[in-house]
Amino acid sequence: KVVESVIVRQPSFFSGLGQLLSNFDAPGWSSWLQWHLLSGSAPFLNKALVEENFAFFGTTLSGTPELRERWKRGVSMVEGVLGEAIGEIYVAKHFPPEAKSRMLELVHNLLEAYRVDIAALDWMTPETKAKAFEKIDKFTPKIGYPDKFRDYSALEISPDDLIGNIAATTKFAMDYEFAKIGAPVDRSEWHMFPQTVNAYYNPGMNEIVFPAGILQPPFFDLGADDAANYGGIGAVIG
C-alpha cells in the first residue's frame, strides 16, 4: 500500500544511517550483523554460551550477581512474545467480568467526583471548566484487559526449535507493527499486558490503563467493600 507520510520520532537516526550507507563497507557490515545475530541468540543457546553471555552483559556491565533460574527466564521469554495470550489465561483465572464491571463503576464515580470539584472551583473560568469537562467526557479508562485479545493464530511455534521460534515471534511482532503504517490509529490497543503489575496514564490518548495484574489485593479485591477499594486502587487512580 502507498503511504504518503509517516511520523518519524528520531529523524537524526535516518540521516546518520544515510551517511553510513553512503560509504558502504560490505565486509564490515556483514561482520557487524553476524555479531548481532550471535549476541542476540546467545541467551537461547547452550549452557556455556548462556553463562558466558550473562557473565559479561549481566554481571560485568549491569552488576547482576546471579543468572535467574532457567524456568524463570523461560516464563519471561514466553510472556514477552505471547503476552496477550498469557494475559487471556491470567484474567480467566484471576479477574472475572464482575471485577471489571466493578472497577469501571469505581472509575466512573471518580470522574463524577472530579466534575463536582471542578464545578466548585472559584479560580477557574467558565471557559476553562468547559474544557475540563470536555476532557472528562473524552476520557477512556482501560481496565483489566482489552475487549479483544490479539490473534496469534498466524504464528507457528515448534516445541523443538527455540531459535526458530524466537525468529518467528520477532517477525510476527514486526509484521504487527508494520501493518499499522497508513492505517487509522487503533484506540483500543493496549501497551501493557493484562498480567502486568503496573499502570499508566497516556496523555496523548487521554486514557488510563490498569491491567488485571495490579487490580489484585491489596489494591483491589472483588470480595472487599467499597471503602477498601476506593482507599486502595481509588487513591492510586485519583
Regions found by a protein language model. Give the residues of each.
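Charge-dense polyanion-binding interfaces
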Residues: 148-163
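Noncatalytic, helix-rich "gating/capping" subdomain that lines the substrate-entry/channel surface
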Residues: 1-105, 109
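Short, intrinsically disordered, charge-balanced linker/junction segments flanking boundaries
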Residues: 1, 237-238
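Second-shell loop/turn segments in exported
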Residues: 3, 92-104, 117-122, 196-197, ...
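Active-site-adjacent "gating/activation" loops or surface patches in catalytic cores
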Residues: 8, 34, 159-231, 236
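Short amphipathic alpha-helical coiled-coil/interface segments
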Residues: 103-118, 132-143
